[in-house]
Amino acid sequence: KANREAGFNKERLMDYFVSLGLEEKLYDKRVNEVSGGQRQRIMLAVTALLDKPLLVVDEPTSALDPESCLRVINFFKSLCSKGMTILSVSHDKQFAAGCDKVFTL
């Protein structure tokens, strides 16, 4: 369950859930009660609540369908428009196409 004791803003978390295509009822689910893709998006939402200037993610869309991938891209763009920098490693060409800057190795 999401840590309600750590000062998380539930309203903002629910906004993030909606942005990422997650149902609000997932807030009360345990980790083993959600799919891998849902778990991945929940962790992105919870991590974004920390309001750090830099978010580093590794393969944030690896277990997601194309629609969920697009939601993550738009979610990241929204965070960036509020001043957050996101550094990601990805092999997903759809994800890379949605990024401002791409470095290929």
Regions found by a protein language model. Name each.
Residues 66-68:
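Helix N-cap at the start of a conserved alpha-helix in ABC-type nucleotide-binding domains
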Residues 72-73:
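Conserved hydrophobic alpha-helix in the ABC-type ATPase nucleotide-binding domain
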Residues 89-91:
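H-loop/switch region of ABC-family ATPase nucleotide-binding domains
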Residues 55-58:
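Catalytic Walker B motif of ABC-type/P-loop ATPase nucleotide-binding domains
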Residues 30-34, 38:
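Conserved ABC ATPase signature
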